[in-house]
């Protein structure tokens, strides 16, 4: 099948199923499967809101809530979670990710930019928390499995009373 024909076969349903799988891997703490959703060069960025209530624009020069320039940073984070070397994740946090309003913003060959809203419910220390926002992914569909090339997360309720981590969003 040529690339043009393959592009025409990538449906919003397939994109949605990929996004749902990534969320499920977080909810089920299937860390290795979750990492497999990401290309080696994948960036992961959640900018912070500045004092003027504007999002920061450069992860290299401004503060971010989370920033990993490539998958290696995610691998290190997962290693710490799995080996209980992260006090921020002890005890385990139970999560339920919900995704809505999935929209294809652009297609560039087999790379598709997707925007969606999300809400994550979290339970830890006998307390429930809710996080919500918008994410924009660039996903490469050229291989056997789709891979995230870029994950941008806008956390819309950033006044929180605990550490935010990769599994909250």
Curated annotation (Swiss-Prot):
InterPro entries tied to this protein:
Benzo_1-2-diOase_ssu, NTF2-like_dom_sf, Rng_hydr_dOase-bsu
Q: Name one GO molecular function term.
A: benzoate 1,2-dioxygenase activity
Keyword Repeat among record annotations: no
What's the EC number here? 1.14.12.10
Q: Which pathway does it serve?
A: Aromatic compound metabolism; benzoate degradation via hydroxylation; catechol from benzoate: step 1/2
Q: Which NCBIfam families does its entry note?
A: benzo_1_2_benB (TIGR03232)
Give the matching PANTHER family.
BLR3401 PROTEIN (PTHR41534:SF1)
Say what the protein does: Degradation of benzoate to 2-hydro-1,2-dihydroxybenzoate (DHB). The beta subunit may be responsible for the substrate specificity of the enzyme.
The protein depicted here goes by the name Benzoate 1,2-dioxygenase subunit beta
- Which gene name belongs to this protein? benB
């Amino acid at each position: 099948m040529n690339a043009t024909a393959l592009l025409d076969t990538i449906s919003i349903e397939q994109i949605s199923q990929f996004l749902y799988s990534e969320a499920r891997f977080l909810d089920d703490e299937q860390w290795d499967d979750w990492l497999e959703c990401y290309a080696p060069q994948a960036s992961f960025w959640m900018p912070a809101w500045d004092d003027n209530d504007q999002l920061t624009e450069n992860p290299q020069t401004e503060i971010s809530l989370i920033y990993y320039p490539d998958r290696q940073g995610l691998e290190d984070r997962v290693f710490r979670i799995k080996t209980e070397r992260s006090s921020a994740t002890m005890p385990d946090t139970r999560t339920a990710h919900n995704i809505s309003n999935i929209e294809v913003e652009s297609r560039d060959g087999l790379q598709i930019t997707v925007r969606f809203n999300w809400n994550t419910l979290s339970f830890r220390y006998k307390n429930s928390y809710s996080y919500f926002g918008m994410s924009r992914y660039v996903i490469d569909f050229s291989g056997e499995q789709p891979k995230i090339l870029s994950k941008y997360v806008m956390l819309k309720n950033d006044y929180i009373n605990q550490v935010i981590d990769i599994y909250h969003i």
